[in-house]
């Protein structure tokens, strides 16, 4: 729903920019339209959970007594929320993670605590909305460039530090 949205496989200047990184990227970038997983009904959700289970196992996370473990360490994380309104969204998400053997929990904190923890990257996962202008520009460097990955207060909350993204 934007003239700036990518459609289909990479072509033209986009393909030229990404070509040096082809070995590091999924083939779909150059061959097909990417589609995110869908969960319109229980069958699609079940298929996604089966795929997630397979990916976890391929990455070395085995199910032991109902808990995903790798090298003896349980797969667990906390989700930081700034509003109780997100709890109704997180509850089914955490429930589905539990089906996979992932020990996840969520916690709503005061906005000032949320902001402080966000600015110092003191979280495992959080809910955050990245506002964009109609014509994205320099703000993308602060959100996704390696130079901002460890800079306190940046909006690179994911810690993205990758030459492919920087290109």
Residue ranges, per PLM feature:
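Short helix/loop segment immediately N-terminal to the Walker
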Residues: 62-74
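Beta->alpha turn/N-cap motifs
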Residues: 128-133
